């Protein structure tokens, strides 16, 4: 399998892992990037844009990364806090007064960041026509009653989180999340990533290949049991095929419809890996960059069905004796982003063939395992 790009010899096992994914058919097209001590040491891509394997993946190919998008939204919110414009411990209603309705007056901003707001889904059944309409979604969320007491437990806000964070940001800055991200992060870092794809980038978008059951949360529906998880995935109702539509690509869904490649994701998160600054561009203070690694809430996530530990947005290793300064998240289908401040490494894997996992899978794990082995060897 032809792999293009560059890879420092020390990280050759990363290239081997990508080649293996492609050769055994686990991937159709993918990109991988690693920054180490603020230098790009891996920038690779290979395979094809489409399931028919008729168009080769290019250096500037971008693709929808689902919940890896959340990591970009977290960075936007961290920047606002760093500037003193946002307090994570403040009530959401301080910035968004209408949000106080239906028992939400005391919901904190950090509850939104950490899937603890009780708003992992909507009572009203909505699909793509609604969740591509910002005003409709934020109006519904402002009126929604929490499904559990905010701050007392977690359930992954797969789609709703981006609207919640994005509306707080909009009330503070007057900009949409996509606008703020483009101006304050992507432009400053020269990163090819978008929350809402511009017209001139649309021809570069790879075609996502859905998993066998293309419904978000398909495994939950298969159980047939009413639960927080089932209700969360039932509305907003998302299917992988939605990503093929122009409405999806052009909308701003800051928890789910970011488009980019591994180079962009790794470059952006090199900021966190290097304590707030990358290649001479400082986006965060060192104190704020370090704060991401401090656990805010841990427990059994009712939507994901597993034990989790969350810092400010990002996932942390849920071990009581863990002292590693590492955070991560991934997207439905397989994309992933890993940031390790101890080694100052940022790792990203982005692909178009979706597997069933919601926050990454074994393909990205093989990439990250190879990258870490290259650093500690």
What is the predicted role of each segment?
Residues 115, 161-168, 252, 256-278, ...:
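Active-site-proximal alpha-helical segments within enzyme catalytic domains
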Residues 253, 274, 278, 288, ...:
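Short, gly/Ser/Thr-rich active-site loops of penicillin-recognizing serine hydrolases
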Residues 2-65, 87:
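Short, conserved catalytic-motif segment at the N-terminal edge
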